[in-house]
């Protein structure tokens, strides 16, 4: 089991990042790959979850061990695979997710890509009362939109749209939030976070 990978951010795309560790490039799928964009050519630590199936071997990466723990718990729910787990983590703040599960708010849970009423109900049945260790108190800044000034980038919005598609959002859903995003000058990472906040309203 690989606990973490530490190295340089070599490549960022809508679905994954590549970490260069001593000349070996690790392809790591993350909730929002563009959150690593401003760390290009710097050393980062990515906590990994190794997903092994008969026809699949993949690494999923997170900035904190707590985020990885939440991902692992989501995978225990029938109907949620790695892609769905990443989409849920990218879309919401952890306290929103935990609150929705604890309050049995199926309507909120169904807003996540690929989550229907059956899966939402299963999330509640499987996870209610089991997420107390994974709350905002444990990692209060996780997923929060950073207040730092954005670096203008001509294709930032286009990259964000591709990232949303990679998370499973339909074109028609994305286009609903594009007009408001076009009024702002943000980094790709911030565009993604802003869009996800609006999609969950």
Curated annotation (Swiss-Prot):
GO molecular function (one): four-way junction DNA binding
Compartment annotation: Cytoplasm
Chain residue ranges for the region called Domain III: 153-201
SUPFAM superfamilies given in the database record: DNA helicase RuvA subunit, C-terminal domain, Nucleic acid-binding proteins, RuvA domain 2-like
Gene Ontology CC annotations of this record: cytoplasm; Holliday junction helicase complex; Holliday junction resolvase complex
Main location: cytoplasm
Renumbered residue ranges of the record's region Domain I: 1-63
Flexible linker: region residues: 143-153
GO biological process: DNA recombination; DNA repair
Domain II: annotated segments: 64-142
Gene3D superfamilies: 5' to 3' exonuclease, C-terminal subdomain, DNA helicase RuvA subunit, C-terminal domain, Nucleic acid-binding proteins
Pfam families in the record: HHH_5 (PF14520), RuvA_C (PF07499), RuvA_N (PF01330)
Alphabetically ordered keywords of this record: Cytoplasm, DNA damage, DNA recombination, DNA repair, DNA-binding
Domain notes: Has three domains with a flexible linker between the domains II and III and assumes an 'L' shape. Domain III is highly mobile and contacts RuvB.
Homology family: Belongs to the RuvA family.
Function description: The RuvA-RuvB-RuvC complex processes Holliday junction (HJ) DNA during genetic recombination and DNA repair, while the RuvA-RuvB complex plays an important role in the rescue of blocked DNA replication forks via replication fork reversal (RFR). RuvA specifically binds to HJ cruciform DNA, conferring on it an open structure. The RuvB hexamer acts as an ATP-dependent pump, pulling dsDNA into and through the RuvAB complex. HJ branch migration allows RuvC to scan DNA until it finds its consensus sequence, where it cleaves and resolves the cruciform DNA.
Quaternary structure and partners: Homotetramer. Forms an RuvA(8)-RuvB(12)-Holliday junction (HJ) complex. HJ DNA is sandwiched between 2 RuvA tetramers; dsDNA enters through RuvA and exits via RuvB. An RuvB hexamer assembles on each DNA strand where it exits the tetramer. Each RuvB hexamer is contacted by two RuvA subunits (via domain III) on 2 adjacent RuvB subunits; this complex drives branch migration. In the full resolvosome a probable DNA-RuvA(4)-RuvB(12)-RuvC(2) complex forms which resolves the HJ.
Protein name: Holliday junction branch migration complex subunit RuvA
């Amino acid at each position: 089991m690989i606990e973490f990978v530490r190295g340089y951010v070599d490549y960022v795309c809508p679905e994954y990042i590549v970490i260069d560790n001593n000349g070996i490039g690790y392809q790591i799928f993350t909730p929002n790959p563009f959150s690593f964009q401003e760390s290009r050519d710097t050393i980062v630590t990515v906590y990994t979850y190794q997903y092994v199936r008969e026809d699949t071997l993949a690494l999923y990466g997170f900035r904190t061990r707590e985020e990885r723990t939440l991902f692992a718990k989501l995978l225990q729910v029938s109907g949620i695979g790695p892609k769905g787990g990443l989409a849920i983590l990218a879309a919401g703040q952890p306290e929103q997710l935990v609150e929705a599960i604890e309050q049995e708010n199926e309507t909120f849970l169904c807003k996540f890509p690929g989550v229907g009423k059956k899966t939402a109900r299963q999330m509640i049945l499987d996870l209610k009362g089991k997420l107390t260790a994974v709350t905002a108190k444990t990692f209060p800044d996780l997923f929060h939109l950073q207040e730092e000034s954005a670096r203008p980038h001509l294709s930032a919005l286009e990259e964000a749209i591709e990232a949303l598609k990679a998370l499973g959002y339909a074109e028609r859903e994305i286009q609903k939030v594009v007009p408001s995003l076009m009024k702002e000058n943000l980094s790709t990472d911030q565009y993604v976070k802003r869009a996800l906040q609006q999609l969950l309203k």
